Amino acid sequence: MKLRFVLGRAGTGKTRRCLDEVRERLAESPDGPPLILLVPEQATFTTEYALLKEGGISGTMRAQALSFRRLAFRVMQETGGTALVPIGENGKNMLLFKLIHRHADRLRLFAGSAGQHGFVEKLNELLTEMKRYGVTPDKLDELAGNAELASPDGLLARKLHDIRLLYAELEGALAGRYLDAEDSLAHLARGFAESSLSAAEIWVDGFHGFTPAEYAALEAMIRSARSVTVALTLDRPYGPGELPGELDLFHPTAETYIRLRELAERAGVPVEEPIVLRPEPAPRWADSPMLAHLERHYGSRTPMAVPDAWLDPAHPNCGVVIRAAANRRAEVDAAARDILRRVQEDGLRWRDVAVMVRNLSDYADLIEQTFSDYGI
């Protein structure tokens, strides 16, 4: 049992290092204990593809790229829980709708809200978030009691009463019959030590932070697995008393780093000296000095002296183009035309394009309409 960190700024090769280490283990012993790459749900396929694309590995049963949910399912196959029926958001929405009608006479605020458009979906989102962050019906009961004492007929007291009631009833309806995504993490935390995966080496990559349920699952892995390696986008190691300011670019991942160290120390698991990657230039930006400079000095606004030729968008070293538009519609239209040109003329793939805006609500309708007109 040991915990290790691979730290580095964006593009410094953290993922490549993790993949290379997995390939080395496979080359040494194709049939050894499990090797698990724990990544976000949307990255499982690309991670597995990247693992097999290089290194002469045509296939393997030992190494797998898994999300928290798929890892939980693997553990439940061995320790129990797969008999429960998986339930998605639509299923929970229908269950909540039924519960609101069933307990209408006990509700103080929400009795007539079930038929309102979007109400059940919003309530389900709220209850899911509460569960994800460890807010139980009992904790809500305590809060509702305090609100009741302050103002028995107040809006907050009535709202907390109804949320607590429906939360408890939903949990009761799910218990023993259904399995939602949040419950699967609890099964993972409880059952990991008893599963065959407790002999695994684990690499965690692609995360900036974790929910309380994910931290509990990671703690179980740190306590039981042969080794856990966590890759984080962080400029350097931080101690408990030197957390960067809340507006610092690396504040969220520094918090994650410190909390994971504390989990390991509390469990009595040794923490190895962090590996800090500082290649110059960073591999991802090797062909784009302007982007490399932007990443390195994003927080300090340090200017970069470049030849005039680099400012031409057609120049290979021009990694950043700044354009002004008369209004948002013209801005979105120009972006759509540029995307279309790059796809048709430069061979860019749709999946290689991202559109980022500061406030999506200001642009969402315009983007949807304009991109639809352009066939994007």
Predicted regions, residues:
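Short catalytic/ligand-binding loop motif for oxyanion handling, primarily in non-cytosolic enzymes
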Residues: 45-47, 72-74, 211-212, 237-240, ...
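Phosphate/oxyanion-binding active-site loops and adjacent basic polyanion-contact surfaces
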Residues: 11-15, 88-92, 177-185, 249-256, ...
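Flexible, charged surface loops at secondary-structure boundaries
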Residues: 27-32, 194-202, 222-223
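Conserved P-loop NTPase-based nucleic-acid remodeling module centered on helicase motor cores
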Residues: 31-145, 151-154
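Accessory N-terminal region flanking or inserted into the helicase ATPase core
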Residues: 2-6, 14, 102-206, 213, ...
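Extended, H/D-rich, highly charged conserved domains that either
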Residues: 202-286
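Anion-coordinating catalytic cores for phosphoryl-, nucleotidyl-, and glycosidic chemistry
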Residues: 2-67, 84, 218-219, 244-246, ...
